[in-house]
């Protein structure tokens, strides 16, 4: 569960290291985002010469959460931390060209097939 002010790791090579959620998109009073939800983020920590810089405000999709994802068979997939993939504000396609770490099968929608194809492991 991601809410405003939550710090997340970045699971791509866009140049950002840590980001902070500033808004959960989708509904006027929506509080929490889970895996597959789009959030508005600001870059808090970035590497030199990256594609993004500190202070940029962008969109991101949540790919891993500590809370986990419940599957219809009752199993729960949990991760050690919260992570996201940074998206282009207009096209909502990933800025980075590589994805680090596993992602869940819940991302397998038409919008995020690019992330699924770049990921090294889909759980």
UniProtKB/Swiss-Prot annotation:
The keyword Ribonucleoprotein applies. Disulfide bonds: none annotated. It comes from the Bacteria. GO terms for biological process: translation. GO terms for molecular function: large ribosomal subunit rRNA binding; structural constituent of ribosome. Keywords: Ribonucleoprotein, Ribosomal protein, RNA-binding, rRNA-binding. GO terms for cellular component: cytosolic large ribosomal subunit. InterPro entries: Ribosomal_uL14, Ribosomal_uL14_bac-type, Ribosomal_uL14_CS, Ribosomal_uL14_sf. Gene3D superfamilies: Ribosomal protein L14 (2.40.150.20). The keyword Ribonucleoprotein applies. Transmembrane segments: none annotated. SUPFAM superfamilies: Ribosomal protein L14 (SSF50193). SMART domains: Ribosomal_L14. Belongs to the universal ribosomal protein uL14 family. Part of the 50S ribosomal subunit. Forms a cluster with proteins L3 and L19. In the 70S ribosome, L14 and L19 interact and together make contacts with the 16S rRNA in bridges B5 and B8. This is Large ribosomal subunit protein uL14. The lineage of its organism: Bacteria, Pseudomonadati, Pseudomonadota, Gammaproteobacteria, Enterobacterales.
